[in-house]
Amino acid sequence: TGVESARDAYIAKPHNCVYECFDAFSSYCNDLCTENGAKSGYCQIAGKYGNGCWCIELPDNVPIRIPGKCHRR
């Protein structure tokens, strides 16, 4: 249909892991999120998956953190 939707979520690395962050005032997460098509992003401290990048209006084609294990190698 050509219509893309977006959602607010933790952007995920391969293996269902969050992009960790440690500074709520750093531009790291906003840069990461906007480079992946989101409206904006920030470092969510002590969230559901620890300190991770949370994106606002992230396109559906970008992986997000889902329930289940983070499979680090």
Swiss-Prot record:
Ranges of residues in domain LCN-type CS-alpha/beta: 7-71
Pfam (any one): Toxin_3
Tissue and organ distribution: Expressed by the venom gland.
Protein name: Sodium channel neurotoxin MeuNaTxalpha-13
Gene3D superfamilies reported in the protein's UniProt record: Knottin, scorpion toxin-like (3.30.30.10)
Residues spanning the signal sequence: 1-5
Residue numbers covered by the propeptide annotation in the UniProt entry: 72-73
